[in-house]
Amino acid sequence: MKRIELIMGRNNPDGGRVSDYMINEFIRNEIMPHFEYGTFIDGEGLWKGEYEKTKIFYIEVADTEAIATAVLLRHVADRYRKQFRQESVLVSEVETSTSWIT
């Protein structure tokens, strides 16, 4: 299993911010149509010494789905970067030991 994470900062280089409404609309239009499950987390972090809020989306997928999922999330990251004038958006892929308890 792999965990693929998309970490979206909410500060703009011009000093603006990505509002709750703006990021929720992005999630609704650009992320939710592509995935049947996944987790969103509100976070905080630093970018170039500046504090910023972040929105994190992560999904656990089978190894056979990891490449396609990572490619899709990289496309989503690029749309977020362009739409909200971000310097960069982080996509991380981590090997996990995960079990679904059903």
Residue spans for each PLM region:
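Generic alpha-helix detector with strongest preference for long hydrophobic helices that associate
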Residues: 7-8, 12, 38, 57, ...
